[in-house]
Design a protein with these regions (language model features):
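A short, charge-rich alpha-helical start-of-domain segment used by transcription regulators
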Residues: 2-38, 67
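Short amphipathic helical patch at the helix-1/turn junction of helix-turn-helix
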Residues: 30, 41, 130-132
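DNA-recognition helix of helix-turn-helix
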Residues: 144-170
């Protein structure tokens, strides 16, 4: 996974030394690694692949700037994910809902996780960024290079598809 990269240990956790060379980089890495790993994991569906993506995100971001912002890190993540998945235009199109599908009540976490993984890549990333990480639509739009209305539409389409997938799994 990290072939040829020397490891440095800080408080028991492993950090690639190619990524973390100073205290400020360590602070940036520590502040953002969990958020970025979660997004990478949900987009790849694989722990090892998510770790590789995470490493590449930080290497790329630290090559661009000594102190990359959260948005720069997000853009680096999207660039890495684009190499793995077809991110781009919204892929779902739903007609107006004539009725609300019956998914009220408790939904098992494993059912929701499976449904999220079945969403198309762009809608999944918008859903994870907005509902999972609390990003605003303007930030999502800037990060993905889409318009704010497209971000809103992608979130709505993703939620409708989740509702459909959850209703069908019952």
């Amino acid at each position: 996974m990290m072939q040829g990269i020397q490891q440095t240990s800080f408080t028991g956790l492993e950090y690639p030394s190619a990524v973390v060379q100073s205290g400020s980089r360590h602070a940036i890495y520590s502040a953002n690694k969990n958020r970025l790993y979660a997004l990478a994991f949900w987009m790849t569906g694989n722990e090892l692949e998510a770790e590789v993506v995470l490493e590449q995100v930080f290497v790329s971001a630290f090559q661009q700037a000594d102190r990359p912002s959260e948005e720069m890190l997000d853009c680096a993540l999207v660039a890495e994910i684009r190499q793995l998945l077809p991110l781009g235009t919204l892929t779902l199109s739903h007609q107006e809902c004539s009725e609300v599908l019956n998914v009220r009540g408790n939904v098992k976490r494993c059912e929701l996780e499976r449904a999220v993984l079945e969403l198309p890549a762009t809608e999944r990333l918008i859903y994870l960024m907005h509902d999972g990480e609390g990003y605003s639509h303007s930030r999502i739009a800037r990060t993905l290079g889409i318009s704010e209305p497209d971000s809103r539409r992608g979130l709505h389409q993703g939620r409708l598809e989740l509702r459909t997938l959850l209703a069908l799994s019952r």
